[in-house]
Amino acid sequence: DLVRSRGLGDVYKRQILDSVDFICLNNPEKLSSETQAEMVKIREKNIRTLSCINYESLEQEWNNKAKDNSELTEEDAQRYLNERTDAMLVLCDNYGYDGILIDYTGLSMVGMQEDVLQQYKARQQNFFSRVLDWRIKHTDKTLVFYGYVQYLAPENMDMLDKYNHLILKTASSKNMEDLTLNVFMAIQAGIDVAGTNAELVPKDRFIACTQFPQQEDKDMIIGYWDTRDANGNKVLAAQGTAQWIVQASPDYTCTGIFIINIQKDYYNNTYGTVRETIHIMNPNK
């Protein structure tokens, strides 16, 4: 099980569950000495800490830079993105992270104009080639892909077996059927590229993503499914996702759950919703 948080301090002080496997930090740069010490402490509980590289954030940095200078070229863009990617990758060694989560949403390539498509594919290739170079030198670290497999260019599909986990972007899913559809869309993307006899998309390492309700969301949209329980209450997305995970499928294996912004479990300071969610997947916990 993975959780995503802005920082370790609040999570650690609230004595996060031992059954959580990974914590992913949204802001992995400029870690305080206190946070680094906490990473060591939770590692003693076999809880590992991942840094996050959000590719869209890097592109947004470049777009903000480029809008003020019309003379900048695509070559400049590639150079900037490469430098920023390298700077983010080196954080794993600098701060002693246990691995990296690659957050890459991407875009649908259907109907893209040719020049836009070529730029999209070139930037994607550059980014992931650097990630894979890092992987070769860090085989003992955990590498996680968090994104839409179907938005990867065909030439990048064969890298997926280098990742320990493939997290599906299902935070906005509203029922079990939608989760299943997301899995099959990822698998189908590999089949479309390689044919039915090849499995470019590993089927044994999927993780579903979900999120908690937010206190300011009075309409109960975020963190809830459209379905209701026996008492007529909206099903919590985290618990619905956990119930989906434990339903075995002959076509794929879902190995865990990824919870965004764990600090949103505001109901009490002992992470009650997290506990209930994990208990669904592992009644012994």
Named regions from a protein language model:
Residues 204-285:
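Substrate-binding cleft of secreted/luminal carbohydrate-active enzymes
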